Amino acid sequence: MSEKYVVTWDMLQIHARKLAARLLPAEQWKGIIAVSRGGLVPAALLARELCIRHVDTVCISSYDHDNQREMSVLKRAEGDGEGFIVIDDLVDTGGTAQAIRDMYPKAHFVTIFAKPAGRPLVDDYIIDIPQNTWIEQPWDMGIAYIPPLVKS
């Protein structure tokens, strides 16, 4: 990946609220299925905004920080997804998204970020990201002091 897109906690919350507003009315949803791990934080934000208490997970491993590798389903939520929002932080090449679509064909699949290759696989998203860009999520970063260029 040649570019990086840094996401801050406040921007993630703003994007999640925007997404939640598009998912109204909340009563139409039975619950949320978070794609672990990237969808866990967005799922918590959606659950809060939509006052949804039923939150489950589907655990799919396809990344090791910045390298994509073979996909493995570790745990899945029951059912075909009818009445459920499935959320992940992003859709990239579409590999994970296609697996989600196959597992939950009746779910409403959303992400915060979408890259061109995976965009057709989600029902809604908030931010377009170029395909060659790596997204740095706030849960993968820390805040560190940086000394000034000129010391007093």
UniProtKB/Swiss-Prot annotation:
Keywords: Cell inner membrane, Cell membrane, Glycosyltransferase, Magnesium, Membrane, Metal-binding, Purine salvage, Transferase
Pfam families, alphabetized: Pribosyltran
Compartments, as annotated in UniProt: Cell inner membrane
Superkingdom assignment: Bacteria
Topological type in the membrane: Peripheral membrane protein
Binding locations of 5-phospho-alpha-D-ribose 1-diphosphate: R37, G38, R69, D88, D89, L90, V91, D92, T93, G94, G95, T96
Gene Ontology cellular-component annotations: cytosol; plasma membrane
InterPro entries: PRibTrfase_dom, PRTase-like, Xanthine_Guanine_PRibTrfase
SUPFAM superfamilies: PRTase-like
Gene3D superfamilies associated with the record: 3.40.50.2020
Residues that bind GMP: R69, D92, T93, G94, G95, T96, W134, I135
Catalytic activity, EC: 2.4.2.-, 2.4.2.22
Pathway: Purine metabolism; GMP biosynthesis via salvage pathway; GMP from guanine: step 1/1; Purine metabolism; XMP biosynthesis via salvage pathway; XMP from xanthine: step 1/1
Positions that bind guanine: D92, I135
Coiled coil: none
Keyword Phosphoprotein annotated: no
Needed co-factor(s): Mg(2+)
GO molecular function: guanine phosphoribosyltransferase activity; hypoxanthine phosphoribosyltransferase activity; magnesium ion binding; xanthine phosphoribosyltransferase activity
UniProt record similarity statement: Belongs to the purine/pyrimidine phosphoribosyltransferase family. XGPT subfamily.
Function recorded in the entry: Purine salvage pathway enzyme that catalyzes the transfer of the ribosyl-5-phosphate group from 5-phospho-alpha-D-ribose 1-diphosphate (PRPP) to the N9 position of the 6-oxopurines guanine and xanthine to form the corresponding ribonucleotides GMP (guanosine 5'-monophosphate) and XMP (xanthosine 5'-monophosphate), with the release of PPi. To a lesser extent, also acts on hypoxanthine.
Record note on quaternary structure: Homotetramer.
Name of protein: Xanthine-guanine phosphoribosyltransferase
Species name: Erwinia tasmaniensis (strain DSM 17950 / CFBP 7177 / CIP 109463 / NCPPB 4357 / Et1/99)
Originating gene: gpt
